Structures are given as C-alpha cells and as structure tokens.
C-alpha cells in the first residue's frame, strides 16, 4: 500500500513538472512574440530580421530542456550513469564533465530506457540525424563488456527508484 502511495506521488510530481515545462514555454513564446511585435510596429526592420535569424532563443531553450530532462530522468533513475558504465569495458566508461548530468550518448540510452526505441524520434529530440543516433548506438554496443547483441536489453533492466 505504501509503495502504491509512493508511486502515485511520483507520477503526480512528474505530471506537474510536465505542465510546468509546457506553461513556462508558452509564456516565453508569448513574451518573444510581443517583443517581435513591438519591434515590427516601430519599424525597426533590421533588428527584426536579426532577431528572426538568430538561433539564440532556440539554443537557450534546448539547453534548458536537456537540463530539465536530465534532472527528471536521473530523478527516476538515479543510478543510471553508474549502472550504464557497469555495462561497459573499464577503458570505455563514460566520464562526464563536472557540470554535466548526461551527455548525448547517455541521453540516447536514457530515451531507450524510457521505451523510445525509434532512432528517428531520438534524433528529433536530440536535434541530430538518424545516422548519428545509429552510429552512437553501434559505437556503444562495441564498447560493451556484455554481449554486444544484449547491450540494449541490459539497459532496459536498469531499474528506477520505484522498482524493487
């Protein structure tokens, strides 16, 4: 009974987190739209074109999204990085930068662990090509300490905080 209560609490937390992300993003887009509108009605066309060509907002939002994804995922799977590394040969273990939670390789496998196995969907999320995802997956299977054909099945066995 306590375990069900805990699982429901975890679900509620992550549903609330999802809505917070969505509403925060909508609010940012409204602010951005209003800023562009003010620039346009004041006929600052050069500035408008500069803003529209800039990828700064998208880059900032992607960085925030990845950070939030990493935190949420590691909240669900707190031992994921060490469990993942346990599946690799000693000389192939992933060493993250001090400020990084996950890197692109780990995000690919985090998405796989969540059940997203389609390389196209993973590529869309990570804003890279499907061949890049395929290459990362192949490279990691080749670094595995376990049977390379079983590597992704072993990833799926990494347990979350609510699993016993």
Feature names for model-found ranges:
Residues 57-164:
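Cytosolic nucleotide-binding catalytic cores of signal-transduction proteins
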Residues 2-104:
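Membrane-proximal linker segments that couple transmembrane helices to downstream signaling/catalytic modules
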């Amino acid at each position: 009974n306590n375990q069900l209560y805990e699982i429901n609490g975890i679900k509620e937390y992550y549903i609330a987190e999802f809505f917070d992300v969505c509403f925060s993003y909508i609010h940012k887009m409204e602010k951005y739209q209003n800023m562009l509108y003010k620039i346009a009605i004041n006929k600052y066309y050069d500035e408008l074109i500069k803003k529209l060509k800039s990828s700064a907002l998208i880059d900032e939002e992607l960085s925030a999204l990845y950070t939030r994804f990493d935190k949420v995922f590691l909240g669900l799977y707190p031992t994921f990085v060490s469990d993942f590394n346990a599946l690799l040969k000693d000389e192939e273990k992933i060493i993250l930068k001090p400020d990084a939670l996950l890197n692109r390789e780990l995000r690919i496998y985090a998405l796989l662990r969540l059940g997203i196995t389609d390389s196209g969907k993973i590529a869309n999320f990570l804003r890279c090509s499907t061949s890049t995802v395929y290459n990362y997956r192949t490279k990691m299977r080749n670094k595995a300490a376990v049977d390379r054909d079983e590597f992704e099945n072993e990833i799926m066995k990494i347990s979350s905080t609510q699993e016993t």
